[in-house]
Amino acid sequence: MTAQDLSVHIARWLDSLPLQAGSKLVLAYSGGVDSEVLAYGLSEYAKQRPDLRYQLIYVHHGLSPNADNWAKHCQARAAIYGLPVTVERVQLILGPRVSVEAEARKARYQAILPHLNPQDILLTAHHEDDQLETILLALKRGQGPKGLAAMGQIQPLSLADKGSCLQVRPLLDISREMIETFAQTRQLVHIEDESNQDDKYDRNFLRLEIIPRLKARWPSIATTASRSAQLCAEQQAIVETEVSERLPKLLVKAPVTEQTVLKLSELAAQPIEWQGILLRGFIESQEFSLPSYVQLQQMLQQLIHAKEDAKVHIRINDCVLRRFAGMLYLDSGETLSTALHITARDLHQEILTLLTQASAMVEDKIVPFALVTTGPRLRLPKADEVVSLGYGLPGQFRCQPHFRDKGRELKKLWQECAVPPWLRAEVGFLFYNDKLVMAFGLWVEKAFCAQGDEIGLSYLIANP
C-alpha cells in the first residue's frame, strides 16, 4: 500500500463496520499526526455517508502549558474538516508510584465514554508501531497470550450500564512512516507534544531508543510482531472458550448473599496449569482487575493449600478475596457500617412499607419480602406490637429458628447457616416489641410462625 491509498484504506475499514443510519463515529482526537490523518479520512468518509453522525473529542489533560493551544488547534482543524468537535477537560489524580501514562489513558476513556451509545463506534488512531510498543511492554511485564495479543483492530468496549460498543483501530496495520508521508502529501497540520521526547516514560523510551534500532536491523519487525500478536489472540480465544465451559461447573450461589462463589475443592481438582487460568477467569467474570502472575500464584497457595481453619483475606487491586466454608468470595471490600441500627415505628398497618425502607440497610437492595400462605413465614404484627429492625446482635443471643426443635446461640447458627463472618453484622433482625421474630434471609422464630393457612411474611434465602 502506498501513502496515497491511505484514505481509501480508511474508507474501506469504515465500510466494513456494522453501521446503521444514526450511528455515530467518534474519534479520540489529540491533534497528533496519527489522529490528524484519521480525522482527515473521517471527513472524506462523511461526504460519502451523510446519514451517519460524526464527532471528534479532544481530551485536555492539563499536563502541558500548551494544552490550551492544542485544544484551539483541534477546534480549528475540525472546522476545516466540517466535523463537530468537543473539548473535554479532565484532572488527573497523581501520586507516588502512579503512572502518568496509565492515569492519562484512564481519564481519556472516562471522558469519551459518556458520548457513546451501543450503536456507535469509537475510532482510535493506533498504528503498527504502537502495536509493537504494546507487545514489547507486555514482554517486559511477563504477560501471557492475553497481554501479548496487544490491541485488536476491532474490540468490544464496555459502556457500563448502557452495554457495549465497538472500538476500531483502522490504522493498526499501517506504519508510522506511511502515516507521516500521507500527512506531508496532504499538507495536514498537526501538533507535536513535547512530552513525547521525554524518555522517562516507557513508551517514549521504546519509541525513541529501541524501536528505531530494531527496525534498522529488521525493517519488517513491526509487521511480524503484529502477526505474533494475532496468533496470541487466536490462542487466547481458544483458552477463553474452554474457560467458559469449565468455569460454570465450579460456581455456585452462596447462602444468604446469593452471590456467585467458587468451589475451592473443585478448583484444586483441576490440572495445576488450569487452576490459575480458571481463577483469573472467575475474577474477570466478576468484573475485577486481574492480578499479576506472581499475585495469582500467591493467591492459589493461600486459597488451596492453607490450613482449612486458616483465615484467608487477600486484597488485590480493587478486589478482596475471602475463603469461607470451602468457597471463594470476591467483593470490593466496601462494607456497610457494623454499628447497631434500630428503627422502630408503630405502624402495623404499614409493615411492607417499613421493610422496604429498611431494605436500604441491606446492601442497598430491595429485600424480597412476600406475603404467602404456605411455607415458613412470619405472622403479621398485632395492633399493639411495635415493629423494629436491628443489626449486630451479640453471638450469645439465643434464637430458635423454625427449622430447630431447640434454641441455640446466634454464633452457632451463623455457622449452621453458612453466613460468612464479614457479613454477619449486616444481617437484619426483625422484632415485635422486644422479641426477635425473624432473621432476614435465614429464619423465622418458631414461636412467631404463621399457622395453618394464615397469611404471613416470608423472606427466606438460606435453606439449612
Curated annotation (Swiss-Prot):
<dbReference type="Pfam" id="PF09179">
    <property type="entry name" value="TilS"/>
</dbReference>
<dbReference type="GO" id="GO:0032267">
    <property type="term" value="F:tRNA(Ile)-lysidine synthase activity"/>
</dbReference>
<dbReference type="GO" id="GO:0006400">
    <property type="term" value="P:tRNA modification"/>
</dbReference>
<dbReference type="GO" id="GO:0005524">
    <property type="term" value="F:ATP binding"/>
</dbReference>
<comment type="function">
    <text>Ligates lysine onto the cytidine present at position 34 of the AUA codon-specific tRNA(Ile) that contains the anticodon CAU, in an ATP-dependent manner. Cytidine is converted to lysidine, thus changing the amino acid specificity of the tRNA from methionine to isoleucine.</text>
</comment>
<dbReference type="InterPro" id="IPR015262">
    <property type="entry name" value="tRNA_Ile_lys_synt_subst-bd"/>
</dbReference>
<keyword id="KW-0547">Nucleotide-binding</keyword>
<dbReference type="InterPro" id="IPR012094">
    <property type="entry name" value="tRNA_Ile_lys_synt"/>
</dbReference>
<protein>
    <recommendedName>
        <fullName>tRNA(Ile)-lysidine synthase</fullName>
        <ecNumber>6.3.4.19</ecNumber>
    </recommendedName>
</protein>
<keyword id="KW-0819">tRNA processing</keyword>
<dbReference type="Pfam" id="PF11734">
    <property type="entry name" value="TilS_C"/>
</dbReference>
<dbReference type="InterPro" id="IPR014729">
    <property type="entry name" value="Rossmann-like_a/b/a_fold"/>
</dbReference>
<dbReference type="Pfam" id="PF01171">
    <property type="entry name" value="ATP_bind_3"/>
</dbReference>
<comment type="similarity">
    <text>Belongs to the tRNA(Ile)-lysidine synthase family.</text>
</comment>
<feature type="binding site">
    <location>
        <begin position="30"/>
        <end position="35"/>
    </location>
    <ligand>
        <name>ATP</name>
    </ligand>
</feature>
<dbReference type="InterPro" id="IPR011063">
    <property type="entry name" value="TilS/TtcA_N"/>
</dbReference>
<dbReference type="GO" id="GO:0005737">
    <property type="term" value="C:cytoplasm"/>
</dbReference>
<keyword id="KW-0067">ATP-binding</keyword>
<dbReference type="InterPro" id="IPR012796">
    <property type="entry name" value="Lysidine-tRNA-synth_C"/>
</dbReference>
<keyword id="KW-0436">Ligase</keyword>
<dbReference type="InterPro" id="IPR012795">
    <property type="entry name" value="tRNA_Ile_lys_synt_N"/>
</dbReference>
<keyword id="KW-0963">Cytoplasm</keyword>
